[in-house]
Structure formats: structure tokens, C-alpha cells
Amino acid sequence: MVDPKRLRRRMVREQLEARGINDAEVLAAMSAVPRHLFVQEALRAQAYEDTPLPIGYGQTISQPYVVALMSQLLEVRRGMRVLEIGTGSGYQAAVLATMGCTVFTVERLRELYQDTGNLLRQLGLRGVHMQRRDGTLGMPEAAPFDRIIVTAGGPEVPRPLTDQLDEGGILLIPVGPRPRAQRLMRFRKEQGRMTGEDLGPAIFVDLVGDHGW
């Protein structure tokens, strides 16, 4: 495998900056996080290509551009508390933690919870707190959150998540009907009300749970 640092620099230049990702903190984090460690060993040669990859158990790691875009759309600042629904490979959580956020992340699949938890610990990402549970219920004991990011698509915005979003916060979630055809929505909470913005079409795995599919 070519030097991962060189591949990351090329990924940032050709896949992210060339497509409008201009948040310096996002670009720095994407340059630093070793994406090849978050994919299956047999697929590591493809880790820095702009494509999603299977991670087992019917799940995928999003393409680098999507991770960067969602990180930029969250408008995070260092020190923010971020709730992530759908840990998956752990790559998105690692990027946000590298940006200086405290990340609370939820995974429902036991195997991914174990595998990803082990990897995050090996990488020394102490700013990531992971639990296994129904993500559509959020993490009420750690609320409120400055930002909430949902990495799976559901039929509607789960009410527990809006309740756990702090005033002035942002919630980013794919919403729409099956099969995996959603709209990426960004909601802002102002004076207790949620105002939504349609950011365009999106394709994500299904959000499974009491308030999902």
C-alpha cells in the first residue's frame, strides 16, 4: 500500500477541496485520521478512494466526501458535545473527535459495537464515548447536545433526538421513504422550534429502531 499520509493528502486535495469542502478544521481532521484502519483489511487499498465500502454486517463506511460534507454541515466548534447515531466503522466519530468535539455515539449491532469500540480504544480517541442501544432513542442521560448527526435514513425525525438537542443546536439527518432514498435535512433549534433545510438527495442505510424502520 502506498504511504497512507500521501494518499490522505491526495484525497483531501482531489476529493474534498475540489468539491467545495473548505472548512479548515474538517480538512485537517480528514488529513489526520487513518481511514485505512476503519475498513476491512482486504479493502485497505481502496480506503482513500471516493467510494463507500462494506464493513460487514450489512453496513458500509461512507465515502470520504460524504463524511467531510456532513462534518462541515454540522458547523461544529472545538469543545462541542456531539451525539452520533450509527457509529458504524467509527470513522465519522474519529473525525469529529479529532476536530476537538466530545462525541457520544450509539451503535445497535453487537459485532460493530465490539469491533469499532476496540479500534477506537487502540487509536487512543478518548473524546469518543460509545454505547450499544437503539439510536432512535438517543442518549438522554448525556443530553443536551450541541449537535446531533444521524448516519442512517429514517421515515421521520425521531422525537427523542429533537428533545435532546440544545437550544441553538443543529441536527443533521437523512429522511425519506424506502428503499434508501432520502433527503439530507439540517434542522436548527431556535426558541424550542425546529426549522428544517433540505440539502438534497441522499442514500444511507436504514435507521432501525423504535422511531425508525
Curated annotation (Swiss-Prot):
Origin: domain of life: Bacteria
Positions of disulphide bridges: none
Entry's Gene Ontology cellular component terms: cytoplasm
Pfam families assigned to the protein according to its UniProt record, in alphabetical order: PCMT
Catalytic reactions on record: [protein]-L-isoaspartate + S-adenosyl-L-methionine = [protein]-L-isoaspartate alpha-methyl ester + S-adenosyl-L-homocysteine
GO molecular function, one term: protein-L-isoaspartate (D-aspartate) O-methyltransferase activity
Localization (cell): Cytoplasm
Keywords, sorted A to Z: Cytoplasm, Methyltransferase, S-adenosyl-L-methionine, Transferase
Enzyme class: transferase
Annotated EC: 2.1.1.77
Role: Catalyzes the methyl esterification of L-isoaspartyl residues in peptides and proteins that result from spontaneous decomposition of normal L-aspartyl and L-asparaginyl residues. It plays a role in the repair and/or degradation of damaged proteins.
Family label: Belongs to the methyltransferase superfamily. L-isoaspartyl/D-aspartyl protein methyltransferase family.
PANTHER family linked: PROTEIN-L-ISOASPARTATE O-METHYLTRANSFERASE (PTHR11579), PROTEIN-L-ISOASPARTATE(D-ASPARTATE) O-METHYLTRANSFERASE (PTHR11579:SF0)
Protein name stated in the entry: Protein-L-isoaspartate O-methyltransferase
Lineage of origin: Bacteria, Pseudomonadati, Thermodesulfobacteriota, Desulfovibrionia, Desulfovibrionales
Gene encoding the protein: pcm
